[in-house]
Amino acid sequence: MKIAVVAANGRAGKLIVKEAVERGHDVTAFVRGENQTAAEKAVQKDIMDLTSEDLASFDVVIDAFGAWTPETLGGHVATSQHLCDALSGTDVRLLIVGGAGSLFVNPEHTQRVMDGPDFPEAFVPLATAQGEELEKLRSRNDVAWTFVSPAADFQADGERTGAYILGGEELTLNEAGESVISYADYAIAMVDEIESGDHIRQRISVVRK
């Protein structure tokens, strides 16, 4: 498959590129600076400058954008909506590296992880931004999007186990009662989702088995 990874130089983006390349996919990294990924093909271009023409030849576009500072958090909504506009009305799938804060913790889907008293205050702005991103996506019936939430403990340097549980809108715990996944295992789940073609216009979540 022809896969575009946007913001590919980030830690999640690089591992997703690596996983897809190792499985034999035709991957193009879209980066702002020098290509630091395993992809042989790279395009230096800001996300907000990408056009429909830039993305038309791909089967799947992965939005791996990440922002953590107050002045850049709005980029989560802005970048994913810009990509939606570029892909509107096409068959190109859009997969977004999402967050865990917006996962629900009750069957009624009225309480989210970030609403709990134990949720770290420092992460509330990021969780809020990614939650808004998801809500905006839910209204995009013109795009084949999938929002992929990691576990609550998303470990950049965690172990690559190759085993994960696929969940949905609710926070999922493994047999050890943990909500944890490494970036490497998340990349496996992301490429599995690309290959399966499931969960169009849905949010899914992944946790280490």
Language-model segments: residues:
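NAD(P)H-binding glycine-rich loop region in Rossmannoid oxidoreductase-like domains
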Residues: 34-90
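Core catalytic loop region at the nicotinamide-binding pocket of NAD(P)H-dependent oxidoreductases
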Residues: 145, 196-208
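A conserved pocket-lining segment of Rossmann-fold NAD(P)-dependent short-chain dehydrogenase/reductase
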Residues: 164-181
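Conserved beta-loop-beta element that borders a ligand/cofactor-binding pocket
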Residues: 135-156
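Substrate-positioning beta->alpha
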Residues: 129, 177-191, 202
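Conserved Rossmann-fold NAD(P)-dependent oxidoreductase catalytic core, especially the SDR/UDP-sugar
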Residues: 82-125, 139
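N-terminal Rossmann NAD(P)H-binding glycine-rich loop of SDR-like oxidoreductase domains
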Residues: 3-23
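Short, polar loop motifs at secondary-structure junctions
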Residues: 29-36, 152
